[in-house]
Amino acid sequence: MSAKTIKVGIIGQGRSGRNIHAHGLVRLKDKFTITAVADGLEDRRKRAVEEFGCNAYATWQEMVENEQLDLVVNASPSDLHFPISLELLKRGINVLCEKPLAKTPEEVDQLIAAQKSGARLSVFQQSRYMPAFLKMREIIESGVLGRIVQVDFTSNGFARRWDWQTLQSNNGGNLLNTGPHPVDQALQLFGTDLMPQVTCIMDRANTFGDAEDYVKIILRGPGRPTIDLEISSCSVYPRAQFTIQGTNGGLTGNSSKLTWKYFKPDEAPKQELITQPLVDKNGNPAYCSEQLTWYEDNWENVAPEGMNAFEVMTNTLYKKLYATMTEGAAPEITPEQIRQQMAVMQECRRQNPHIYTTA
């Protein structure tokens, strides 16, 4: 694409289409132009015209048939992500789809195949660019924590919920609603080249719908860290959002602040395995004991003026998408990667037939 400004159409003007995407694109006027929106509610269409100076349509079909768009953002309700994205790709239209991309890996396969039209499918997994997550990856890759044994991802709180995203028919529930963010991060650390062994427990605690609002997932694999991922709506005392256990130290924190602590093996006392009972200098039974020199560091997120961490993630994703569409930069988030995410979630549903009769 040679055009320097990408013409965007947005499907949906709700919490995602307006509050996340449209407001994010307004910050990047040198790269993107909101040309049109589509929403079934008249008041939302009127508001979009006033706020963004764009055209507005009642249906996405009208929008794409009447506008020359370079990109369509699919921020429709979750259960419509797959069918609308599939139709757009078949029409040769580039798509940026909100999470969840689909419900099953088979649906993702159809979306990947539909790119034969020449259109590109991108996925809005903006948490991949969470500053705290990027810092975590930097710390892990530095090696100071040693071999990573376990990583915990926790998205917990206490809430009762009774809206459309509590229904299975709408692709609701904590797994498909909140899950795409931490599961994507977890799989980035686990590795996208191997399907993990999945263990999952689900419950319906405080939801008024038929989908789950408690999810516990354990991911394992040879030579990979164990992933402990929890999404709960019944946690009055939530744990840290991130916890890492390593052979030389560990990390804890959240999207705002991280703290990590480690020792340096080359400074540690030299030890050898002793197979006989341990005794102290007086000959009394003893436990293993040593003095390690610990190093501790921390990081705090400092967002650019006028932006919060969430807006930074959105801004980063759109800038990278722009580079892919106009400069030929390789995409960092691919539907092939998200297929693994859908496969993990499908296995989670399969293991919980008391909630999901079909995976």
Model-derived regions: residue spans:
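Contiguous beta-strand/loop segments that form the cofactor/metal-binding neighborhood of enzyme cores
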Residues: 177, 184-269, 307, 315-329, ...
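Rossmann-fold dehydrogenase core element
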Residues: 110-126, 147-152
